[in-house]
């Protein structure tokens, strides 16, 4: 029931089983012979891991690079942190009486149990709940972090087990691009946010102006969905050296803007006003006659209706540069200059995703496509737009060679009766709390009325939903409703501390796997060799679900694994990639030789792919290469959305003022920006030594404009209480001119650590609103929130976010 990013990008899957081993595989002897250096990979790239005396002591990147990646130093922290879950645990009240625990989740102590006890308890309660309520009562969407490997994928393996059990409720979409990936098929016929981009070589050769709209690639390109090929940052480095002008539109002077230095012009609009700014630019293009009428006529539909809105004919409000200046805080003259600059040059509009993680977020990328269409450069070398240059190294040309298939939630020869009977469903991922609060409730989604399932059981496998979901306090209340919550995880996250049953799982350094670098480039195949033995009682997800499959029915383990162990599956995946490579006349070594060599495989460059232009074929022949929209063209006005009739997502790009923004703020309220952190992957690695690089007063930092800090009596390094009607957090002040006045930034991903209602660690989502972007996508809107700030003068509170929970002896 879940379509992953990898599926968006790769469009490949395989019905496959998983490993079941009852003991740790022995460490390979060659590790000692070669000084203990082991090649592996994570989402932050291929790494060499050094092992001494059974412990990881260091890790470094395995690929050459110009810009260092701090995340690659964290392998030892990941394995040996004191935040690891060490043993199977059950909440005491739940263990005493699973049907009526006397204490709530998050208030109880834990009891250590054996693996046999834990799995037996899960099986019995899962079976009871499923028989009483049906498959839709079991939520196994389990959104969150994942291993880079093609085999050991927690969410997939959970859903594989649930399919064998008879089905489950899953999720649709993701928190990263929830609004854009639903609106874009209506506009350009694809999800767009996970598509290959016009190649970087063409950008460097042909683009004259590059606009970075709400994106910070120096942070976000440290990671990928699989494993980063690290080329995106190298290309941005080349862009800097080229001296091409860069326009950076962002409320905060990000690391990327600092990186470009004098090459970059920083424009800081009020948060949430990007559509108004784009409309002001579009209006200027139109009034100056600089919009490309030929392109609009040939390649788009609906521009005349949009122009009526742009001119104010439809609502008596011309969307002029002066109008936009009032809303955005960007001077009228600068808006006019932007329009003229874009029209006079080959311009690439690169946009990030944070701008659509807002109320009415669907409008942002739709309007940017409309602006690009008015410029008429879509489908040209170095012109148009791109939504994935900041993610997984989009634009690094796709290589020729083998591509690894991945584990599937489907089992060969098995079909879910629940799916056939309509017993399985999927809810928009960011609406999990709405579903818990309103079982059986009706809601609109992408033109259809849907029904929330009555969720009685939740299993979250390897995900930090207490950090990535909005309005933490509301989530905690809703989290009390299900009858059973299981978390299988490596670390004592806030989600784990609010579970009934907690299972300790291995990290990627404690098992074997394979991965590829570059979600778009498929540049390398990298082995992920087990570096150390499983810590404490940690087990692979595979083992856990295979054992549970056996409890479902005799022979269940054999069905689940399809009779293959870990190395057999890795060989199976590798052999499939090798076969694909052979068809393209690319040679790969045999699996056993590859595994022993401790080297990655780099695929062959493609001159054709280095000349790839997104929408180039469409521009060359819009009839033969029609888009996947009803008209076959770019839809600036959508008849489909017109029929939906959603007031919060009209039929053309529209400026819709959010509920919480500068325009609704009182004199003491500030807008909250929840940007991507520099030294974490969302909440991953919050416990690591890297925290010392950014924590202020041992808290998550808050970036405050100098004038705002002075107004509230806050100095650099002070503890700052940040609050609104949803909650309060404690942060450490970073005072600077590098942020828009009236905006504060708390990076997303700090682990919640609540004491008497105050989050001591500074988790931004304690403050954000859990509202849908619109009825169309129902995506998260975490960047639409107002807050108050003050210097904290209370007693210093001890940070406990990374501590073990209380355990009853």
UniProtKB/Swiss-Prot annotation:
What does the entry's cofactor note say about binding and number?
A: Binds 1 molybdenum-bis(molybdopterin guanine dinucleotide) (Mo-bis-MGD) cofactor per subunit.
Names of the cofactor(s): Mo-bis(molybdopterin guanine dinucleotide)
Gene Ontology cellular component terms for the protein in this record: outer membrane-bounded periplasmic space
- Enzyme class (EC, first level): oxidoreductase
PTM remark:
Predicted to be exported by the Tat system. The position of the signal peptide cleavage has not been experimentally proven.
Any Pfam family from its record, for instance, is Molydop_binding
User: Where do the annotations place Mo-bis(molybdopterin guanine dinucleotide) binding?
Assistant: 176
Q: Where is the signal peptide?
A: 1-31
Catalyzed reactions: trimethylamine + 2 Fe(III)-[cytochrome c] + H2O = trimethylamine N-oxide + 2 Fe(II)-[cytochrome c] + 3 H(+)
EC number(s) given by UniProt: 1.7.2.3
Places the protein is found: Periplasm
Instruction: Specify whether Acyltransferase is a keyword of the entry.
Output: no
Keywords on record:
Metal-binding, Molybdenum, Oxidoreductase, Periplasm, Signal
Gene Ontology biological-process annotations = anaerobic respiration
Family of this protein: Belongs to the prokaryotic molybdopterin-containing oxidoreductase family.
Please give the function described in this protein's UniProt entry: Reduces trimethylamine-N-oxide (TMAO) into trimethylamine; an anaerobic reaction coupled to energy-yielding reactions. Can also reduce other N- and S-oxide compounds such as 4-methylmorpholine-N-oxide and biotin sulfoxide (BSO), but with a lower catalytic efficiency.
What protein name is recorded for this chain? Trimethylamine-N-oxide reductase 2
* Species: Escherichia coli O6:H1 (strain CFT073 / ATCC 700928 / UPEC)
């Amino acid at each position: 029931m879940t379509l992953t990013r990898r599926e968006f990008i790769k469009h490949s899957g395989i019905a496959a089983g998983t490993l079941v081993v009852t003991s740790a595989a022995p460490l390979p002897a060659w590790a000692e012979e070669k000084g203990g250096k082991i090649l592996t990979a994570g989402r932050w790239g291929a790494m060499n891991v050094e092992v001494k005396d059974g412990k990881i002591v260091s890790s470094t990147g395995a690929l050459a690079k110009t810009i260092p990646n701090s995340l690659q130093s964290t392998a030892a922290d990941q394995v040996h942190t004191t935040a690891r879950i060490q043993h199977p645990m059950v909440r005491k009240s739940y263990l005493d009486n699973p049907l009526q625990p006397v204490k709530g989740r998050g208030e109880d102590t834990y009891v250590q149990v054996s693996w046999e006890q834990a799995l037996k308890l899960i099986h019995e309660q899962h079976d009871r709940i499923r028989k009483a309520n049906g498959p839709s009562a079991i939520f196994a969407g389990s959104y969150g972090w994942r291993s880079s490997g093609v085999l050991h994928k927690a969410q997939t393996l959970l859903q594989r087990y649930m399919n064998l059990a008879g089905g489950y409720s899953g999720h649709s979409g993701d928190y990263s691009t929830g609004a854009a990936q639903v609106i874009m098929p209506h506009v350009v016929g694809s999800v767009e946010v996970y598509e290959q981009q016009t190649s970087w070589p063409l950008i460097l050769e042909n683009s004259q102006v590059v606009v970075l709209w709400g994106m910070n690639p120096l942070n976000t390109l440290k990671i990928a969905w699989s494993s980063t090929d690290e080329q995106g940052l190298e290309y941005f480095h080349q862009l800097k050296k080229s001296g091409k002008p860069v326009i950076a539109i962002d409320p905060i002077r990000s690391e990327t803007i600092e990186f470009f230095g004098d090459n970059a012009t920083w424009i800081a609009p009020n948060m949430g006003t990007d559509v108004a700014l784009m409309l002001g630019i579009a209006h200027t293009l139109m009034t100056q006659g600089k919009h490309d009428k030929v392109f609009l006529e040939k390649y788009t539909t609906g521009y005349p209706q949009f122009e009526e809105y742009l001119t104010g004919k439809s609502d008596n409000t011309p969307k002029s540069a002066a109008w936009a200046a009032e809303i955005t805080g960007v001077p009228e003259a600068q808006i006019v200059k932007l329009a003229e600059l874009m029209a006079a040059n080959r311009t690439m509009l690169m946009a990030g995703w944070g701008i659509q993680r807002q109320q009415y977020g669907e409008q942002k990328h739709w309007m940017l496509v409309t602006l690009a269409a008015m410029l008429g450069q879509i489908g040209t070398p170095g012109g148009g737009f791109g939504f994935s240059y900041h993610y997984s190294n989009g634009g690094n040309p796709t290589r020729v060679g083998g591509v690894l298939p991945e584990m599937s939630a489907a089992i060969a020869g098995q079909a879910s009766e629940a799916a056939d009977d309509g017993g399985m469903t999927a809810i928009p991922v960011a609406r999990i709390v709405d579903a818990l609060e309103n079982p059986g409730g009706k809601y609109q989604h992408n033109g259809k009325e849907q029904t929330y399932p009555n969720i009685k059981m939740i299993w979250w496998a390897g995900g930090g939903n207490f950090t990535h979901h909005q309005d933490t306090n509301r989530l905690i209340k809703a989290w009390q409703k299900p009858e059973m919550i299981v978390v299988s995880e490596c670390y004592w996250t806030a989600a784990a501390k609010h579970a009934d049953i907690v299972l300790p799982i291995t990290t990627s350094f404690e098992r074997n796997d394979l991965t590829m670098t570059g979600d778009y480039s498929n540049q390398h195949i990298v082995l992920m060799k087990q570096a150390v033995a499983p810590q404490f009682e940690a087990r692979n997800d595979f083992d856990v679900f295979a054992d549970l499959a056996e409890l479902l029915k005799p022979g269940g383990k054999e069905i689940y694994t399809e009779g293959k162990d870990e190395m057999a599956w890795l060989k199976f995946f590798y052999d499939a990639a090798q076969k694909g490579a052979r068809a393209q006349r690319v040679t790969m070594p045999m699996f056993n030789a590859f595994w022993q060599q401790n080297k990655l495989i780099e695929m062959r460059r493609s001159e054709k792919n280095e000349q790839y232009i997104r929408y180039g074929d469409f521009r060359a022949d819009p009839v033969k290469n029609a888009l996947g929209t009803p008209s076959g063209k770019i839809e600036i006005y959508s008849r489909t959305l017109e029929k939906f009739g959603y007031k919060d997502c009209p039929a053309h790009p529209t400026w819709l003022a959010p509920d919480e923004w500068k325009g609704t703020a009182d004199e003491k309220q500030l807008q909250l920006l929840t940007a991507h952190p520099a030294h974490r992957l969302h909440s991953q690695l919050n416990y690591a030594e890297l925290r010392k690089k950014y924590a202020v007063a041992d808290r998550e930092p808050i970036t405050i404009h100098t004038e705002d800090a002075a107004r509230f009596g806050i100095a650099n390094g002070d503890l700052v209480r940040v609050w609104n009607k949803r909650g309060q957090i404690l942060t450490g002040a970073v005072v600077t001119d590098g942020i828009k006045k009236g905006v504060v930034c708390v990076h997303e991903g700090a682990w919640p650590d609540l004491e008497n209602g105050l989050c001591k660690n500074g988790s931004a989502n304690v403050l954000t609103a859990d509202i849908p972007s619109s009825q169309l996508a129902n995506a998260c809107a975490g960047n639409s929130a107002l807050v108050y700030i003050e210097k904290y003068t209370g007693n210093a509170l001890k940070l406990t976010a990374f501590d073990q929970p209380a355990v009853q002896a």
